[in-house]
Amino acid sequence: MSKRDYYEVLGVGRDASEREIKKAYKRLAMKFHPDRNPGDKAAEASFKEAKEAYEILTDTDKKAAYDQFGHAGVDPNRGGGYGGGQGDFGDIFGDVFGDIFGGGRRGGQRQAARGSDLRYNLELSLEEAVKGLTKELRIPTLATCDLCDGSGAKKGTSASTCTTCHGQGQVQMRQGFFTVQQPCPTCHGRGKIIKDPCTKCHGDGRVEKSKTLSVKIPAGVDTGDRIRLAGEGEAGEFGAPPGDLYVQVSVREHAIFVRDGNNLYCEVPISFSKAALGGEIEVPTLDGKVSLKIPAETQTGRMFRLRGKGVKSVRSHAVGDLLCKVVMETPVNLNDRQKELLREFEATLTGESKKHSPKAEGFFDGVKKFFQDLNS
């Protein structure tokens, strides 16, 4: 069975803190613990799944490997991978008492494992995420060996029945008063032995390979979105189904725009004269420049909304807006004539601050009252 994403298992986001991960695990462990659900196989499976996810995501090294490579990064059967702890008291006592009372629950030949899921972290520009595109991705993976067609045996030969377990994949061992059933150490639970391994894959049935995929990225994706490509993960063992490929999207910061859901935000500088007298300015959008009418006496920080100039949702197809915040820019590098004109203008305002600068007048009146109250 395909493994679910560990963050999805615990019901937390990819940016969850260790405390949030522990809290989520505790809640699931209380809900699905075998002692609370005797005989419930589904609850037992959910408990083990949550335990495995918790052990990976609370280990710094394992979490880093999982975030980069998905389940393949923590697969103990791959070089450099980390193994998630999957054993618990249920495994031990299930084997012991299962054999005493008539056959262990895990008896029989081990099934060939489905291929591991892969994750590819894809970084996009804002323009690419908003408009969509097709990306060529080069994916390192395990592919079915083309020399032995995934059997692991040398061409012209086939696997033979294991003489240790006689094809059962399990052996019984005495431990004190108990008989314990364990995977066969000779064939590793497969029930078959490859005497003449393939010269290319050395008996594994799979080889390391890189493949190139053309992946269509839909318009409107955002950081945190995930695209699933069924069957594009690692090849399964000895003919088992392949895993899936998950493309994890992240969007780079933009020099002009900030995205919040389907809306875009930007700051647009305007001159003092334009803010005071009004007029038209050019505003950037992802589709090009548009004109924006600025009313006279516009204050810095005022927000203008351009409807339909945001992002089209990848799910609902609703289109967001562009919100432009105008910021008045103080002129610099003035020449003598310009400075003189500003002084003349300032002089015309003397004694009329309430009329021309009501906010400033109100502010200084408040400051004056504050100190009067302080000294009274």
Swiss-Prot record:
Domain of life assignment: Bacteria
CR-type zinc finger span: 132-210
Location relative to the cell: Cytoplasm
Reported cofactor(s): Zn(2+)
Comment text on domains: The J domain is necessary and sufficient to stimulate DnaK ATPase activity. Zinc center 1 plays an important role in the autonomous, DnaK-independent chaperone activity of DnaJ. Zinc center 2 is essential for interaction with DnaK and for DnaJ activity.
Positions bound to Zn(2+) 2: 162, 165, 184, 187
Gene of this entry: dnaJ
CXXCXGXG motif repeats: 145-152, 162-169, 184-191, 198-205
CC cofactor note: Binds 2 Zn(2+) ions per monomer.
Protein's recorded name: Chaperone protein DnaJ
GO CC, alphabetical: cytoplasm
GO terms, molecular function: ATP binding; heat shock protein binding; unfolded protein binding; zinc ion binding
Coarse class of the protein's main subcellular location: cytoplasm
